[in-house]
Structures are given as C-alpha cells and as structure tokens.
C-alpha cells in the first residue's frame, strides 16, 4: 500500500516570540520540520506535502525539492490546512499520515507501528495517542469495549469521569486517503473559533460506521509539540538524551552526557571517548578509538580512527588516522590532515592539505597550501596567501623544514628536503635540498649602554 504524508507547518507560532518561522527553530542543530521530514523519508513515505503559510519561502529554502507544498493563505483550522493538500493527494489511493511540523521527537519506528496498527485493524482512521501524567488541555481518548476509539473529547467538554482519562490525542493520525478528502468536504466551522477542525473527520467516519482505531506511543515525551521556548528547550534536552544514549549503547564513552551535544546525523565509532563540552554537529563522522574534547566543536567533518581533537574547532575538514589536533587549534574550509599529523596550539589551517607525519605545533596560519609528508612548520610560520584582492598557493614538498617566524609569500614553492632558516621572509622558490636565508644579518654594538 502507498503511504503519503501531510505535514502541518502553516502556524504563525506567535508564542515563540521570534522572527524565525516556528517550525524552522532548530532542535539538535536541525530545523524541527526537517526532523519530521527525515523520519517520514526513513519510513519510505511516497509523497510528503508540507502545508505552509506566511513563512512559505523560508520553509521551501530549508526543505527544497524533497517535498511538495500547499499554501494555506488563511489559518482556518487543522481541517482546512489538510484540505489544502487535496490538489496534490486527492486522487491517490492509500494511507495518509497527518503530522505536525513542530513534533521533532517523533520517530520513524513509532510512525511505522502506527501504520501497521492501522492496516491490521482495517480502520479508516487511526489516532496516535499517548499517556500523560498531566493531561490538562489535551483531548481525551474514550475507547469502547472493543478497544477502538469511541470518541475524542476535548478537555473543556469532558465530564468528571472523562477528565480522569490519561490517554490523550497527540494530533498525529493515519487516514484512508480517499475517505479523508471526502469527509473534509463535510466538516463545518460552526464552533466558537469559526475554524474547520481535523478531528471532526473522526466524527464523520464514526457516523458512517467506520472503525476508528488508536495506537499508543511508548512515551508521551516523544509526541510533544513545540509551541514556545520552554517546550523548545525540553525537546532539545530530550533529543540530546536520546541521541547520547544511542551512542553509548554502540560503545561510545561519554564522560559527561549532560554537557555533550551530538547532532542527529552524526556517526561515531566504538571505543571513542567524548569529554565534556564536546559538540558534534552536521554530517560529521568520528572513527573508532578517538579522543574528542574537552570543549571541542566539530561540524560537517570526518575524523579517522585513533585521532585526538582537544579544545579545538573543526569545520568542513578531514582529520586522518592517529592525527593530533589542539589544544586551541582551528581547522576550516576543507582542511585535510593525513595520518599521524599534528596541529598544535593556536594553529589555524584553511583550505590546506598536510601529508602524513607533517606538523605545525605552535602559533601558525596555514592557508591555501599543500604540505607534503614529514614537513615541520616551526613556531610562528605563516603562509602569506592574500594580497588584498586574490588568494595564492603555497607548496611545501616532502621532508622540508620551515624554521620559526618564517613568512612564505605566496605563490611560492619550497622543494623536497629544503630548509628555510628562522626569521626569513621567502618570496622566491626554494630548490630541493636548498637552504633559504632571507633576513638581515645581525649587527651587535658592544658597550652601547
């Protein structure tokens, strides 16, 4: 059977008190609505339609062409929002998930179980429910003797007995697609808010004698919608806890899980140790037996097995096996370190490649450079790559030795096994096995004072 999805993302989110569209607020470094789309994609949903409102262009910029869109120009209720998807999905046959774009904690496993329960019961509608310790404000699920849903009662309409029910409506549903759009045509807005409510479809299906099923999520926490900054912080904490526990079960050591932040797309090898203050975000891969942290920030980067990154910032870069980075180093914009390299304190590397065994241990800037194998860059050595208009390349070949406080004025090449004396400013190429000295001879005046 084909599965489709409608993602409700048109709400203004006024309680967030933000210029940023509500569903674009990040949880674990990723917009909330992107979490929802990713889980549905993992599930194999055939088509996803995102209902957008006044922030449509911002949502499209984030999600791109991976989904389809329908515009709800006026917010006239959840039923009206889903109806906006009819031009896209109205003729399809199958099951349609309706999910809110502000539910970043929902997992593909729960949604899969919901779809499976829907199929097994033969229901036309299946509601995702949860058991809440405090159900205040939520619609209550009233089940019949057969275990199916008898009705959903809003909190304000519930009697004393119904208020004791802890099973609540989460706002996530599966509908038979054809029934959904036919029933939406019958939904009225004769209520206090003057809106078209999606749960009214359940009443219509029930009146037609259809089965209304319910499937309970394993935790209430997974189903929460984020409507303000308090809930956003709660979702962040829950996501971090879930992610960290997953990696701990995969053999990764967290010295202090509460202060370690791992993004949802990060991959970590076994026997790696993460120290406090570590952030791993974006499409980052960490190998096995690595040491990361304390206080390291790594984004969209690859770290190979047995590498060490301490108190450093790494962005869009690659670190080779058994390489050592830090403390207080900065790798960015396609920095690539080979095996057994060393980048030490207060060294910045940008758009540069270090061959195996090469090192820059202290106080250096290496930009737009190609460094061979077993090269030593002395303390304070700088690749001078920018003339105010253009960037230029520096090449340092295998086994070269660059002394302290050397300026390499690009474009320039230092040949294999060459030596550049400390304090030199090099403007011309240095040949293989050559020695370059580019500094004033010392003048000493005895008895000057």
From Swiss-Prot:
Residues reported in the UniProt entry to bind acetyl-CoA: 385-386, 422, 439
Note accompanying the cofactor annotation: Binds 1 Mg(2+) ion per subunit.
InterPro entries: Bifunctional_GlmU (IPR005882), GlmU-like (IPR050065), GlmU_C_LbH (IPR038009), Hexapep (IPR001451), Hexapep_transf_CS (IPR018357), NTP_transferase_dom (IPR005835), Nucleotide-diphossugar_trans (IPR029044), Trimer_LpxA-like_sf (IPR011004)
GO CC term, one of those recorded: membrane
Swiss-Prot/TrEMBL cofactor(s): Mg(2+)
Residue ranges of the region described as Pyrophosphorylase: 1-229
Region annotation N-acetyltransferase: where it falls in the sequence: 251-449
Gene Ontology molecular functions: glucosamine-1-phosphate N-acetyltransferase activity; magnesium ion binding; UDP-N-acetylglucosamine diphosphorylase activity
Active site: 362
Region described as Linker: spans on this chain: 230-250
The entry's keywords: Acyltransferase, Cell shape, Cell wall biogenesis/degradation, Cytoplasm, Magnesium, Metal-binding, Multifunctional enzyme, Nucleotidyltransferase, Peptidoglycan synthesis, Repeat, Transferase
Compartments where found: Cytoplasm
Enzyme Commission number(s) from the entry: 2.7.7.23, 2.3.1.157
Pathway: Nucleotide-sugar biosynthesis; UDP-N-acetyl-alpha-D-glucosamine biosynthesis; N-acetyl-alpha-D-glucosamine 1-phosphate from alpha-D-glucosamine 6-phosphate (route II): step 2/2; Nucleotide-sugar biosynthesis; UDP-N-acetyl-alpha-D-glucosamine biosynthesis; UDP-N-acetyl-alpha-D-glucosamine from N-acetyl-alpha-D-glucosamine 1-phosphate: step 1/1; Bacterial outer membrane biogenesis; LPS lipid A biosynthesis
Keyword Cytoplasm assigned: yes
KW Cell membrane (keyword) present: no
Binding sites annotated in the UniProt record for Mg(2+): 102, 227
Pfam families assigned to the protein according to its UniProt record, in alphabetical order: Hexapep, NTP_transferase
Primary location recorded for the protein, binned into one broad class: cytoplasm
Functional description taken from the UniProt entry: Catalyzes the last two sequential reactions in the de novo biosynthetic pathway for UDP-N-acetylglucosamine (UDP-GlcNAc). The C-terminal domain catalyzes the transfer of acetyl group from acetyl coenzyme A to glucosamine-1-phosphate (GlcN-1-P) to produce N-acetylglucosamine-1-phosphate (GlcNAc-1-P), which is converted into UDP-GlcNAc by the transfer of uridine 5-monophosphate (from uridine 5-triphosphate), a reaction catalyzed by the N-terminal domain.
Name this protein carries in UniProt: Bifunctional protein GlmU
Gene designation: glmU
